[in-house]
Amino acid sequence: GYHRRVVLGCNMIPGVLDQEHYDLMAAANFRFVLFGLESAAESTLRRINKCGKARDIEASMAMAKKAGLEPHVTCMVGYPWETRAEAQATIDLTRRLFDRGVIDTLQATIVIPYPGTPLFKECREKGWLKTEDWDRYDMREPIMKTELPDAELMALTRGIYTSFLTPRFILRKLLAIRSWAEVGGMEREIVV
């Protein structure tokens, strides 16, 4: 049926599904599964009202990978209250997941407090916003005042990309090719 011709993807919250449900997703031809790794710090996850726990992140991605899905992680750093150690722990967790092979692709971004969100409201109330020029709310620069200098925050996010493009990653991607049509998609994934 159509479930073999239509490839599906979705966003997921770590810690919500068990192995049986990931297996069902794979049987329904889900492929790409995006997990937001907002932080490795439990205190930040609670503060931004994320129902997943840091300890659930690795297990969830391993189950998705075991089911044959292709986990993608969006790693975020740059909260106003985040310490250097907490930001580095989030980056380190992302690298560890990637090195273990439980995620296929990743993205590192600077947290942006979008209007209408509780984070934006808190930033405005506490004077943490650097600008309200909406053209700059594109994840390419820090918009909030943080403990980390802007240059260091930018270096953290850029550093994650240079650390993943290894021979092991390239081999893993080549071995995962299921059809010639995927080769073009793989090229788009690697070019960041």
Predicted feature descriptions by range:
Residues 120, 128-192:
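Radical SAM enzyme core and accessory elements
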Residues 20-23, 80-99:
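Catalytic cores of alpha/beta
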Residues 1-72, 77-79:
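Conserved SAM/AdoMet-binding glycine-rich loop
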Residues 13-14, 77-81, 108-119:
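Short, solvent-exposed turn/loop segments enriched in Gly/Ser/Thr/Pro and often Arg
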Residues 25, 35, 94, 106, ...:
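Conserved, mostly hydrophobic/aromatic
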Residues 28, 60-71, 97-101, 156, ...:
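A structural motif corresponding to the C-terminal end of an alpha-helix
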Residues 31, 103-104:
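Short acidic/polar active-site loop segments enriched in Thr and Asp
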Residues 18, 57, 87-90, 153:
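Aromatic/hydrophobic pocket-lining residues that form the small-molecule binding cavity
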